């Protein structure tokens, strides 16, 4: 980083990587002129674990537990993108029931991610009370995850061709009760937060991004939709069963931190609508496509035995990825999560490139904080919503 040539004495401040508002091990080298930000340089890589290289040395079923460590607050989306790629390469059809359950889990994960963004974001700008209310609702979502998958986080629930297990008895009623309860709580958030004059002073007009600027920077998710671009991959790509439900893209025109807050708050309400429709119209039938377990009998006859595949239900590492390349993407809570996958007729991917939304969205931070106050850095960084496990991979 070059020191700006000015006649004033500037101060260089290190924020992070242990600062509580960095939301992980992010380090910012901030150049200050008094309280005004002159320059900001993000330093990444403290949580780099070589996730792409690990993928190239694992079968897909072996790699699934790893992907939940990317964005560890929205693990259903990392699992979804990991199984969607091989499903498209192998032309594997997912049963309708499994697709509906996937949608339910994805939207619950979106709500949990937005809640865990909202609580610390409010704490960053000085509002402590909403933090505890928001974490109470998040616990209810995690209770639903634990009942269905056995894990509160790192669920390992998605499988190639379906899901790991069907929904347990009574889970649907419990989830519907949560939906009714949560809609009333969103109204409480609006009363407590959205109309609070102190909150509005901190976020209104701070970190403004125009629509064309957002596109040029490659932003996605709430960052893009808050800048006046109604772009949502659930509507554009129509993956899973999203085109069978009625819901609206939530977007704002202002492009500031307040607009990004409003988009995420409205998205939680839309997610509840999708979950309610999916639960009420949940079809019967199988929850996995057993044909996805079919392999080359000549090469590995013991892995195709009835006892191995259907009695013990052991996943075989011989699922071959056909020799072609593919880009798959989903609308994660933070934006467009994608993978570029190249198969070479073997059990391991030849190339596995991750497109993390948090990494792309973080690139605009230095532009947003220049000429702002030091205290606005926390507001702007919090409104971007990053998880360093996904940024560093």
UniProtKB/Swiss-Prot annotation:
Alphabetical list of Gene3D superfamilies matching this protein: Cytochrome-c3 Hydrogenase, chain B
Pfam families attached to this UniProt entry: Complex1_49kDa
Gene Ontology cellular component terms for the protein in this record: chloroplast thylakoid membrane
GO annotation, biological process: photosynthesis, light reaction
Documented EC number(s): 7.1.1.-
First-tier enzyme category under EC: translocase
InterPro entries to which the protein is assigned, alphabetical: NADH_Q_OxRdtase_suD (IPR001135), NADH_UbQ_OxRdtase_49kDa_CS (IPR014029), NDH1_su_D/H (IPR022885), NiFe-Hase_large (IPR029014)
Highest rank taxon of the organism: Eukaryota
UniProt KW Lipoprotein keyword: no
One term of GO molecular function: NAD binding
Annotated compartments: Plastid, Chloroplast thylakoid membrane
Catalytic activity: a plastoquinone + NADH + (n+1) H(+)(in) = a plastoquinol + NAD(+) + n H(+)(out); a plastoquinone + NADPH + (n+1) H(+)(in) = a plastoquinol + NADP(+) + n H(+)(out)
Keywords carried by this UniProt record: Chloroplast, Membrane, NAD, NADP, Plastid, Plastoquinone, Quinone, Thylakoid, Translocase, Transport
Membrane topology annotation: Peripheral membrane protein
Function: NDH shuttles electrons from NAD(P)H:plastoquinone, via FMN and iron-sulfur (Fe-S) centers, to quinones in the photosynthetic chain and possibly in a chloroplast respiratory chain. The immediate electron acceptor for the enzyme in this species is believed to be plastoquinone. Couples the redox reaction to proton translocation, and thus conserves the redox energy in a proton gradient.
Protein family per UniProt: Belongs to the complex I 49 kDa subunit family.
Subunit: NDH is composed of at least 16 different subunits, 5 of which are encoded in the nucleus.
PANTHER family referenced in this protein's UniProt entry, alphabetically: NADH DEHYDROGENASE [UBIQUINONE] IRON-SULFUR PROTEIN 2, MITOCHONDRIAL, NADH-UBIQUINONE OXIDOREDUCTASE 49 KDA SUBUNIT
Identification of the protein by name: NAD(P)H-quinone oxidoreductase subunit H, chloroplastic
Gene that produces this protein: ndhH
